[in-house]
From Swiss-Prot:
Entry keywords, A to Z: Ribonucleoprotein, Ribosomal protein, RNA-binding, rRNA-binding
Domain of life: Bacteria
Gene from which the chain derives: rplT
Species of the source: Stenotrophomonas maltophilia (strain R551-3)
Full protein name: Large ribosomal subunit protein bL20
Stored Gene3D superfamilies: 6.10.160.10, Ribosomal protein L20 (1.10.1900.20)
Amino acid sequence: MARVKRGVQARRRHKKILDLAKGYYNARRKVFRVAKQAVIKAQQYAYIGRKQKKRNFRSLWITRINAAARINGLSYSRFMNGLLKAGITLDRKVLADIAVHDAAGFTALAEKAKGALAA
Protein backbone atom coordinates (compact mmCIF):
# COMPACT_ATOMS: atom_id res chain seq x y z
CA MET A 1 0.00 0.00 0.00
CA ALA A 2 1.26 3.46 -0.90
CA ARG A 3 2.42 5.85 1.79
CA VAL A 4 0.08 8.80 2.33
CA LYS A 5 1.77 12.13 2.83
CA ARG A 6 -0.39 14.90 4.25
CA GLY A 7 1.73 17.95 3.45
CA VAL A 8 -0.88 19.50 1.17
CA GLN A 9 -3.70 19.21 3.72
CA ALA A 10 -1.50 20.53 6.53
CA ARG A 11 -0.38 23.49 4.42
CA ARG A 12 -3.99 24.27 3.51
CA ARG A 13 -5.14 24.04 7.15
CA HIS A 14 -2.26 26.22 8.36
CA LYS A 15 -2.83 28.77 5.60
CA LYS A 16 -6.52 29.04 6.48
CA ILE A 17 -5.77 29.79 10.14
CA LEU A 18 -2.89 32.17 9.35
CA ASP A 19 -5.10 34.06 6.89
CA LEU A 20 -7.69 34.50 9.65
CA ALA A 21 -4.91 35.80 11.95
CA LYS A 22 -3.97 38.55 9.50
CA GLY A 23 -3.54 41.85 11.33
CA TYR A 24 -2.55 40.28 14.66
CA TYR A 25 0.77 41.20 16.28
CA ASN A 26 3.97 39.11 16.45
CA ALA A 27 3.64 35.34 16.99
CA ARG A 28 -0.14 35.57 16.94
CA ARG A 29 0.22 36.23 13.21
CA LYS A 30 3.25 34.09 12.34
CA VAL A 31 3.25 30.93 14.47
CA PHE A 32 0.49 28.45 13.65
CA ARG A 33 0.03 27.10 17.17
CA VAL A 34 -0.30 30.58 18.71
CA ALA A 35 -2.32 31.92 15.78
CA LYS A 36 -4.83 29.08 16.09
CA GLN A 37 -5.46 29.93 19.75
CA ALA A 38 -5.77 33.63 18.91
CA VAL A 39 -8.25 32.95 16.10
CA ILE A 40 -10.39 30.66 18.28
CA LYS A 41 -10.48 33.30 21.04
CA ALA A 42 -11.31 36.02 18.51
CA GLN A 43 -14.19 33.94 17.16
CA GLN A 44 -15.49 33.45 20.72
CA TYR A 45 -15.36 37.20 21.30
CA ALA A 46 -17.13 37.79 17.98
CA TYR A 47 -19.91 35.34 18.91
CA ILE A 48 -20.39 36.95 22.32
CA GLY A 49 -20.23 40.41 20.74
CA ARG A 50 -23.08 39.62 18.37
CA LYS A 51 -25.26 38.82 21.40
CA GLN A 52 -24.11 41.89 23.35
CA LYS A 53 -24.76 44.17 20.39
CA LYS A 54 -28.50 43.50 20.61
CA ARG A 55 -28.52 44.31 24.35
CA ASN A 56 -26.40 47.42 23.90
CA PHE A 57 -28.57 48.88 21.16
CA ARG A 58 -31.78 48.22 23.10
CA SER A 59 -30.22 49.95 26.11
CA LEU A 60 -29.16 52.91 23.94
CA TRP A 61 -32.66 53.24 22.47
CA ILE A 62 -34.23 53.18 25.94
CA THR A 63 -31.79 55.86 27.16
CA ARG A 64 -32.62 58.12 24.20
CA ILE A 65 -36.38 57.62 24.61
CA ASN A 66 -36.10 58.31 28.35
CA ALA A 67 -34.18 61.55 27.76
CA ALA A 68 -36.72 62.79 25.20
CA ALA A 69 -39.67 61.70 27.37
CA ARG A 70 -38.31 63.60 30.38
CA ILE A 71 -38.01 66.75 28.26
CA ASN A 72 -41.76 66.33 27.67
CA GLY A 73 -42.52 65.77 31.36
CA LEU A 74 -42.82 61.97 31.42
CA SER A 75 -40.64 59.17 32.67
CA TYR A 76 -39.74 56.37 30.26
CA SER A 77 -42.06 53.84 31.89
CA ARG A 78 -45.05 56.23 32.00
CA PHE A 79 -44.39 57.26 28.38
CA MET A 80 -44.32 53.64 27.19
CA ASN A 81 -47.42 52.80 29.23
CA GLY A 82 -49.19 55.82 27.74
CA LEU A 83 -48.33 54.70 24.21
CA LEU A 84 -49.62 51.22 25.00
CA LYS A 85 -52.93 52.61 26.32
CA ALA A 86 -53.21 54.95 23.32
CA GLY A 87 -52.81 51.96 20.99
CA ILE A 88 -49.59 53.27 19.41
CA THR A 89 -47.33 50.33 18.57
CA LEU A 90 -43.91 51.68 17.65
CA ASP A 91 -40.83 49.73 18.62
CA ARG A 92 -38.01 51.25 20.64
CA LYS A 93 -35.71 51.55 17.63
CA VAL A 94 -38.20 53.73 15.75
CA LEU A 95 -39.09 55.75 18.86
CA ALA A 96 -35.40 56.47 19.52
CA ASP A 97 -34.96 57.56 15.89
CA ILE A 98 -37.95 59.89 16.17
CA ALA A 99 -36.59 61.27 19.47
CA VAL A 100 -33.24 62.10 17.86
CA HIS A 101 -34.35 63.37 14.44
CA ASP A 102 -37.91 64.69 14.90
CA ALA A 103 -38.42 66.48 18.22
CA ALA A 104 -41.84 67.84 17.19
CA GLY A 105 -43.06 64.38 16.25
CA PHE A 106 -41.87 62.96 19.56
CA THR A 107 -43.62 65.78 21.43
CA ALA A 108 -46.86 64.85 19.62
CA LEU A 109 -46.40 61.23 20.70
CA ALA A 110 -45.75 62.37 24.28
CA GLU A 111 -48.98 64.41 24.27
CA LYS A 112 -50.93 61.37 23.03
CA ALA A 113 -49.34 59.28 25.79
CA LYS A 114 -50.26 61.91 28.41
CA GLY A 115 -53.82 61.98 27.10
CA ALA A 116 -54.12 58.21 27.30
CA LEU A 117 -52.75 58.18 30.85
CA ALA A 118 -55.19 60.90 31.96
CA ALA A 119 -58.20 59.11 30.46
